Amino acid sequence: MDGHTNGTNGSCSKPCEPLTDYCIPDYILNPDSEQVLVDQAPCCPVVVFINSRSGGQLGSSLIKTYRELLNKAQVFDLSEEAPEKVLHRLYCNFEKLKSNGDPIAFQIQSNLRLIVAGGDGTASWLLGVVSDLKLSHPPPIATVPLGTGNNLPFSFGWGKKNPTTDQEAVKSFLGQVKKAREMNIDSWHIIMRMRAPQEGPCEPIAPLELPHSLHAFHRVSGSDSLNMEGYHTYRGGFWNYFSMGMDAQVSYEFHSERKRNPEKFKNQLTNQSTYAKLGLKQGWFAASLTHPSSRNIAQLAKVRIMKRPGGQWEELKIPRSIRSIVCLNLPSFSGGLNPWGTPGTRKVQDRDLTAPFVDDGLIEVVGFRDAWHGLVLLAPNGHGTRLAQAHRIRFEFHKGAAEHTFMRIDGEPWKQPLPKDDDTVVVEISHLRQVTMLASDPCKSKSVNDPSSPMCCSNHDDDERNSLEDEDEWEEGRKKFGAADTFKFPDEVDVAHLS
């Protein structure tokens, strides 16, 4: 990048020559910097956000490497600076420079790509920030897997294993970012409303002291159009999934344990092992003898769906054994498993189901009975209990059904108290808009606009042995599953991802 060879004028840290395709000059990043002459804009300018608390020590190491290879001013530690402030400052500067006739600013803004390294919650945080900016041409986002589940990176071909942090690995990743294709995905709006209680708390309880722990789900102000007198209203958004029930409870316990003992969570393998142990402890592999109502979705809430835009609300019957319900937008949950799968031809005809796309305005609703049910996903054509595809879904909580429930949005769990004397607690999910991701090969997500995506469902007849959607068949199957002396998990299966 000719024209900014001085360190004060935005040079990349050495060695920088091979990476001029990505480096952004200081005067673009910092409005107070002196403008310098730049002959040519980088062809793939990137701004990098890294959660230094993710991946044990990997986050901090990754920051160091990116700052060695790029302009330090374009690499941000999310524990030190919020992305909304960074991007607001950057885009305000873009507009100022473009109004002054700067062609470099125009080219960099047009070609800008964002990189976010962290867990699914971190990636969702950045997606929310970009959505909130409401830009006419929002920058597409690439995700570096640096968490426990890494569902978002896996969905778009970036893998699910935590990366190495040496310079060659980072250079290779940047090369993939440059070649990656853009893919739109649906954004989902979530609103929760409850009557203001006479006594007792009803605020969502955040298990993590991170700046974004409940960024995607916060209480609306009194002036917000969604606010209603006498009610507490919360709003947020998600891109991968919303879940409620036992899986969210296990996730909550994991995050709480990590907060209490951070020194025990230094690598991905340890984290996954701890996750599996907590699942066993919480009864996710074996239902409690007392069958508490908080673990049975049907006893907890009535569920209604609207199948298509402008359609009618209709009640969705939930089998009594379902202890976890997942509203899924992407084909990756619990570390890369696909709970929806691809419905067979008979299912399509009988139940009006379609192949899952990430940009079709529909969300897949899947139920799980317990973690053993999750093991079905490992079988060919295996899937959870397909409940519905919907444009909107509403949970109406029964009065006094439970003191609390557990919820999770894109990897961020919380314990949600419920007022005992209120039968008006409602959670509603609806399609909002779309954001743009960067996809690399092999990409699990499918777009309705991609000619290579299957526009119809598979020819298999949906192997009922794997779905076990009949209650009696499930009970009999559960007694037998895993009972043989020769039964064992395949070597490549990580049991931590089955929760």
From Swiss-Prot:
EC number(s) given by UniProt: 2.7.1.107
Limits of the DAGKc domain: 41-194
GO biological process: defense response; glycerolipid metabolic process; intracellular signal transduction; phospholipase C-activating G protein-coupled receptor signaling pathway
Tissue-specificity statement: Highly expressed in roots.
Nucleotide-binding recorded as keyword: yes
Assembly: Monomer.
Family under the similarity heading: Belongs to the eukaryotic diacylglycerol kinase family.
Further comment: Plants overexpressing DGK1 exhibit decreased density of lateral roots and increased thickness of seminal roots.
One GO cellular component term: membrane
Species for this entry: Oryza sativa subsp. japonica (Rice)
Keywords, sorted A to Z: ATP-binding, Kinase, Nucleotide-binding, Plant defense, Stress response, Transferase
Induction statement: Induced by infection with the rice blast fungus Magnaporthe oryzae, and the inducer of plant defense responses benzothiadiazole (BTH).
Listed name of the protein: Diacylglycerol kinase 1
Residue stretches of biased makeup (Basic and acidic residues): 459-468
SUPFAM superfamilies per the UniProt record, alphabetical: NAD kinase/diacylglycerol kinase-like
Primary role: Phosphorylates the second messenger diacylglycerol (DAG) to generate phosphatidic acid (PA), another important signaling molecule. PA is required for plant development and responses to abiotic stress. May play a role in disease resistance responses to pathogen attack. Modulates root architecture by regulating the ratio of DAG and PA, which have opposite effect on the promotion or suppression of lateral roots vs seminal roots. Suppresses lateral root number, but promotes seminal root and crown root thickness.
Region (Disordered): 442-479
Main enzyme class: transferase
PROSITE patterns the record matches: DAGK
Disruption phenotype: Increased number and density of lateral roots and decreased thickness of seminal roots.
Taxonomy of the source species: Eukaryota, Viridiplantae, Streptophyta, Embryophyta, Tracheophyta
Alphabetized InterPro entries for the sequence: ATP-NAD_kinase_N, DGK, Diacylglycerol_kin_accessory, Diacylglycerol_kinase_cat_dom, Diacylglycerol_kinase_pln, NAD/diacylglycerol_kinase_sf
Catalysed reactions listed for this entry: a 1,2-diacyl-sn-glycerol + ATP = a 1,2-diacyl-sn-glycero-3-phosphate + ADP + H(+)
Bias-annotated ranges (Polar residues): 446-456
Gene Ontology terms for molecular function: ATP binding; ATP-dependent diacylglycerol kinase activity
